[in-house]
């Protein structure tokens, strides 16, 4: 038994040759099996030759930070709100605020913080191609903003009075500023400041003011805009009758300016305060208004006289769709320096007269109504006429000549003074008056002579 064990040990100690290996290995004979074992050869099996070169295994370290879910924490410059937003859904909800509270919803990303939050805004005085005078916009924006602010120990005038010459674009400039600020004003006109019923205009002002206050209470900016206040509440010489409604309109505006947050309607008296509503009024001559209304504590006054740059800017907006060069616009403005801004709008409209005249001659005067109102094809369309500098200057001179005719003739004074057209019948009137006076004098003399004869007869 001992021999068999040693034999097995010898068999197990047989050296292995990897380089010179053969298909099979011989098994030594042992006493345990009784006879020597046959050599077994594996057919069709060959071991690949292994190179004598030394094998070197290289392990490359993987940089896991490139795939890190929190990589934005070290390569992005942002605030805590951005970092918390990245961790939404990755952190236990126990340590997060409820959804929708704003903590995990970023308002801006890092680029927007740099490009928008640090942006300085300038007063852009253009709106849809129309020009807004910087001084005009500054006055309105500051006045409206002041009335919505709470300034310490400062009484802000509630009313802003914009006044100036006729046709200078006061109302249109106000509308542009309102659109620029996103304000939808409550508008009134001078025709609403008079009524057949005493007290109606004053009540209407209070109603409109409270409507604007309700809009402000709902979170939208609003103001009360009154056009041509002096035409409805002012006194234009001795020919204007001063009525009770004029007095009540002035008194109502004064009361609202003194108590802007306590405006009551007739029959409705409560202590609930309303929102403060800035009031913008326009006019041509505020000296015709009641003096206590326009004092500094109640009304801030702004005289609007457009400069040459303002007139050029507004005219560029008027001719913006007509392909008129800027040099031509400047030439037109300088050619009519004493005209109002409205003059240039009328000048542009006058250019279309030729197109309308051509359409009328081609249609016929008898068919104008049918073509304009009852045509299946709709109203006629016109091609935009070509506006040249020469044509605009020609029509401008025609408008100036018409203005001069009105100033020169002054038929109204002639009508009131002579009841005749000009001096055509002046001689006839004077002759008629002298004849009538002579006849009246002779008639009086005859009556006196008759009375004298009658007295003498009685005596």
Swiss-Prot record:
<dbReference type="GO" id="GO:0009570">
    <property type="term" value="C:chloroplast stroma"/>
</dbReference>
<dbReference type="GO" id="GO:0046863">
    <property type="term" value="F:ribulose-1,5-bisphosphate carboxylase/oxygenase activator activity"/>
</dbReference>
<dbReference type="InterPro" id="IPR027417">
    <property type="entry name" value="P-loop_NTPase"/>
</dbReference>
<keyword id="KW-0809">Transit peptide</keyword>
<protein>
    <recommendedName>
        <fullName>Ribulose bisphosphate carboxylase/oxygenase activase, chloroplastic</fullName>
    </recommendedName>
</protein>
<dbReference type="InterPro" id="IPR044960">
    <property type="entry name" value="RCA-like"/>
</dbReference>
<keyword id="KW-0150">Chloroplast</keyword>
<keyword id="KW-0934">Plastid</keyword>
<feature type="binding site">
    <location>
        <begin position="164"/>
        <end position="171"/>
    </location>
    <ligand>
        <name>ATP</name>
    </ligand>
</feature>
<keyword id="KW-0547">Nucleotide-binding</keyword>
<dbReference type="GO" id="GO:0009579">
    <property type="term" value="C:thylakoid"/>
</dbReference>
<dbReference type="InterPro" id="IPR048571">
    <property type="entry name" value="RuBisCO_activase_AAA_helical"/>
</dbReference>
<dbReference type="Pfam" id="PF21228">
    <property type="entry name" value="RuBisCO_activase_AAA_helical"/>
</dbReference>
<dbReference type="Pfam" id="PF00004">
    <property type="entry name" value="AAA"/>
</dbReference>
<dbReference type="GO" id="GO:0016887">
    <property type="term" value="F:ATP hydrolysis activity"/>
</dbReference>
<dbReference type="GO" id="GO:0005524">
    <property type="term" value="F:ATP binding"/>
</dbReference>
<comment type="similarity">
    <text>Belongs to the RuBisCO activase family.</text>
</comment>
<dbReference type="InterPro" id="IPR003959">
    <property type="entry name" value="ATPase_AAA_core"/>
</dbReference>
<keyword id="KW-0067">ATP-binding</keyword>
<comment type="function">
    <text>Activation of RuBisCO (ribulose-1,5-bisphosphate carboxylase/oxygenase; EC 4.1.1.39) involves the ATP-dependent carboxylation of the epsilon-amino group of lysine leading to a carbamate structure.</text>
</comment>
């Amino acid at each position: 038994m001992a021999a068999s064990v040693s034999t097995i040990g010898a068999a197990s100690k047989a050296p292995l040759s990897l380089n010179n290996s053969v298909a099979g290995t011989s098994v030594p004979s042992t006493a345990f099996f009784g006879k020597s074992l046959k050599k077994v050869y594996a057919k069709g099996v060959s071991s690949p030759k292994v190179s004598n070169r030394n094998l070197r295994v290289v392990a490359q370290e993987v940089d896991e930070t490139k795939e890190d879910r929190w990589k934005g924490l070290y390569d992005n410059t942002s605030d805590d709100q951005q970092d918390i937003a990245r961790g939404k859904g990755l952190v236990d909800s126990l340590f997060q605020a409820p959804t929708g509270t704003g903590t995990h919803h970023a308002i801006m990303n890092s680029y927007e913080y740099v490009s928008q939050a640090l942006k300085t805004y300038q007063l852009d005085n253009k709106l849809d191609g129309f020009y807004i005078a910087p001084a005009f916009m500054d006055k309105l924006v500051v006045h409206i903003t002041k009335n919505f602010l709470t300034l310490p120990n400062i009484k802000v005038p509630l009313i802003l009075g914009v006044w100036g010459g006729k046709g200078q674009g006061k109302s249109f400039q106000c509308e542009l500023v309102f659109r620029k600020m996103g304000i939808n004003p409550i508008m009134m006109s001078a025709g609403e400041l008079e009524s057949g019923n005493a007290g109606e205009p004053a009540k209407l002002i209070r109603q409109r003011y409270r409507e604007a206050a309700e809009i402000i209470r709902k979170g939208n900016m609003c103001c009360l805009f009154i056009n041509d206040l002096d035409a409805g509440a002012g006194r234009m010489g001795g020919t204007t009758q001063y009525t009770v409604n004029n007095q009540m309109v002035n008194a109502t505006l004064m009361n609202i300016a003194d108590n802007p947050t306590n405006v009551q309607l007739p029959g409705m008296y409560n202590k609930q305060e309303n929102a403060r509503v800035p009031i913008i009024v326009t006019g041509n001559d505020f000296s015709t208004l009641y003096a206590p209304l326009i004092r500094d504590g109640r009304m801030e006054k702004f005289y609007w006289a457009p400069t040459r740059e303002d007139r050029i800017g507004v005219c560029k907006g008027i001719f913006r769709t007509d392909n008129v060069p800027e040099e031509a616009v400047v030439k037109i403005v300088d050619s009519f320096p004493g005209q109002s801004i409205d003059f240039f709008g009328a000048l542009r409209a006058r250019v279309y007269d030729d197109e309308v005249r051509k359409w009328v001659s081609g249609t016929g005067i008898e068919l104008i109504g049918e073509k304009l109102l009852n045509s299946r094809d709709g109203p006629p369309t016109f091609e935009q006429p070509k506006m040249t500098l020469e044509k605009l200057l020609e029509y401008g001179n025609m408008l100036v000549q018409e203005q001069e005719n009105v100033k020169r003739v002054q038929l109204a004074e002639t009508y009131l003074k002579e009841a005749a057209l000009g001096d055509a019948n002046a001689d006839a009137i004077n002759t008629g008056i002298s004849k009538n006076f002579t006849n009246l004098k002779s008639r009086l003399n005859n009556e006196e002579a008759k009375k004298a004869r009658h007295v003498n007869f009685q005596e």
